[in-house]
Amino acid sequence: MSTGPPTAALDVRALLATLDRHAVRYTVIGGIAVQVHGHRRTTKDLDVIPAPDEANIGRLVRALAELDARPRDAPGAGPPTAQQLASAPTVPPLTTRHGELHVMRDVPGAPPYADLRARALVVDLDGLPLAIAGIDDLIAMKRASGRAADLRDIAALTAVDQPER
């Protein structure tokens, strides 16, 4: 249960445009990725895995500053630093001017970032290139999580691939 202040309504396009302006390399996972792969469901946040190199983390820090990103459960704290983003096993959920953003680092079931990105589906969202975790990687992450919502996503995603009878 969140104890922080309510976040702005999710505006995925605005979040992604900010990351794009700062040339942040990332791959989208979570609910948005599930939607792109054909399962229509709601989500209240954007989940991304950033490329882990130092230069990319620096660009991500600048994008988070522009977004006024703050830890959801520590509203008095400032945006994460490059050191926190590079070394923290878990980055707390962030509130931003455009909704909640989850910057994920060590995601159970996820391959190394280079492999995740190489297998990503790249789509165009109103002129923004968007790397979405490939369906097999997405299912592996959801299976490793084991949460009820993730298991429902797996069932829906695998049903999408099944021919109708």
Language model regions located:
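Compositionally biased terminal segments of proteins
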Residues: M1-R165
